[in-house]
Amino acid sequence: MEQIRKNFEEENIKIQILGCYMDLGNPDDEVRKNAVDTFKKCLKFNQILGASIVGTETAYPRLSLEEKKIWHPYMMDSVARLVEEAERLDVDMALEPVYWHPLEDLETTVEVFEKMNSDRLKRIFDPANVLEFPEIDQDAYWKEWLQALGDKI
């Protein structure tokens, strides 16, 4: 890891986001444990690499509305454990909301940030991932997102 960081530094390249996209809401205990453990390792690696943020989504598959409800408490548990580790290591982490995942919309995203209440938790904002209905008033839609969570991007 140290050599990777050094090679980037020699080329004056700053690693902005270390992507570690894991299945954090999966109800399968073994899958979720592996996801949390892997993300924790990336948080630790980041102490060496020095990226601004270690980022993830909260699932892999496209989930139905019912599946998102089932996966939600598992996601919350995983995120809480990761935020605790990020705080312990003094490293920032970020979540990326995706319409098809348990972290699916503004309401759920606000809930996560309020419950976690950590300066170490940030947000990756890819508008295409949260736009369910493109025919809506996008100006109002994005304004709502940015007013609620713009300081977390």
Q: Where are the language model's segments positioned?
A:
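Glycoside hydrolase catalytic-domain groove-lining segments
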Residues: 135-153
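Active-site acidic/histidine proton-transfer and metal-coordination neighborhood
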Residues: 2, 7-14, 24-125, 132
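Active-site-adjacent segment of FAD-dependent monooxygenases/related oxidoreductases
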Residues: 21
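Zn-dependent metallopeptidase/amidohydrolase metal-coordination segment
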Residues: 18
